[in-house]
């Protein structure tokens, strides 16, 4: 309710892609996995967004034109796409080694993937999904970026190109994850306290009823 058709499509496609990744946590990072996830993620949204474009674009297929996003202009799309297999392979190797914290791996993958920007649309959503796929493979909590942190997230991505470092994105990933866990702990604490108060109320009511019955 209250959603545009595009927003409804995005929710549907995102659910399908997320479900697909959940069912394939035992699979390594490959181009086949990446393209199929993109196909599901943009199955309805891509055709809706590009229905009037002169250049055709299909879900699950790499871009055929150079890309830009906001004020960021990416390089030669063919040269960038050639680097995708190496990114996936090296990320999987580091994951298998177990020598680096999964959050660092997820952040570095995301930063490099967004730099490559290999698809016509959905690169941001796909990058975040694949980062969470990496985290879930190592049984780490999901990284959810709230709208209130969107500008900080974009700034951290831009720092990679501007300052040639991903430390800001790594720091952002850790802080965002910790903040979410703290919020969940607080919510569970409140639920527990409410449950205890409810049980005490029930016991008091029962005790009052027992006292009345003895009169």
Model-derived regions: residue spans:
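FIC/Doc superfamily catalytic core
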Residues: 1-121, 125-215
């Amino acid at each position: 309710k209250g959603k545009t058709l595009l927003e409804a499509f995005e929710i549907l496609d995102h659910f399908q892609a997320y479900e697909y990744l959940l069912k394939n946590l035992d699979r390594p990072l490959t181009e086949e996995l990446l393209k199929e996830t993109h196909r599901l993620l943009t199955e309805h949204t891509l055709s809706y967004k590009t229905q009037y474009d002169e250049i055709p674009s299909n879900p699950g297929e790499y871009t055929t034109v150079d890309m830009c996003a906001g004020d960021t202009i990416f390089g030669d799309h063919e040269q960038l796409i050639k680097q995708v297999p190496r990114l996936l392979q090296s990320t999987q190797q580091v994951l298998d080694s177990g020598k680096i914290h999964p959050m660092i791996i997820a952040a570095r993958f995301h930063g490099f993937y967004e730099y490559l920007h290999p698809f016509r649309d959905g690169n941001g959503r796909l990058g975040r999904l694949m980062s969470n796929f990496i985290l879930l493979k190592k049984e780490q909590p999901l990284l959810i970026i709230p709208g209130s942190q969107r500008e900080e997230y974009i700034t951290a991505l831009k720092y990679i190109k501007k300052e040639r470092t991903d430390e800001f994105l790594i720091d952002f990933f850790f802080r965002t994850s910790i903040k979410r866990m703290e919020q969940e702990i607080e919510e569970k604490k409140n639920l527990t306290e409410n449950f205890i108060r409810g049980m005490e109320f029930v016991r008091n009511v029962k005790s009052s009823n027992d006292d009345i019955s003895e009169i």
